[in-house]
Amino acid sequence: MSTGPFLGEILRYFVVLLMLAAATAKLRDLAGFRDNLASLFGMGPALRAVAAPAVAVAELAVAVLLLGGLTHAGLLAALLMLGVFTALVGYKFYTQSVVRCGCFGEAERSLSGLDLLRNVLVMAAIGAGLAQPAGLTPPLHVAVLAASLGCLACVVAVHFHEIVHLLSPSDG
């Protein structure tokens, strides 16, 4: 297996795990996510009751597409979802300054420019994945390695804000 398809496999698992992490966080605190939709977008109770689980289900559907062998469709769906979400939340961030997202269950922390940067980096990675040619199904040991590296990338993405702060010089 050449490098391109292997990197594509890593990316596929990365996006699968990222979508599963986002959906799981929302489903674990669906009431909190519904409340967050009200504060972020001013949604009424009826719309929030539908939108909150629909977002989580859409994230799960992207993971299923990617795991089911529809990599191109899954990556396109992930790119579209993340692009729309980042644009909406980015607009709110720049117009209101204090925005709570809670995409990965961190509702107590305000959104920062680092979160938007993370999303842009994830979208760039997805774009790179879309540019990869469709490969053959890798052997099991290659798939396990790709999934492991995708998992590592997912942990870095989910905790990007905290990792950057840990690696930044402190003020004293």
Question: Which residues make up each language-model segment?
Answer:
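Membrane-interfacial helix-loop segments of redox and metal-homeostasis proteins
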Residues: 1-171
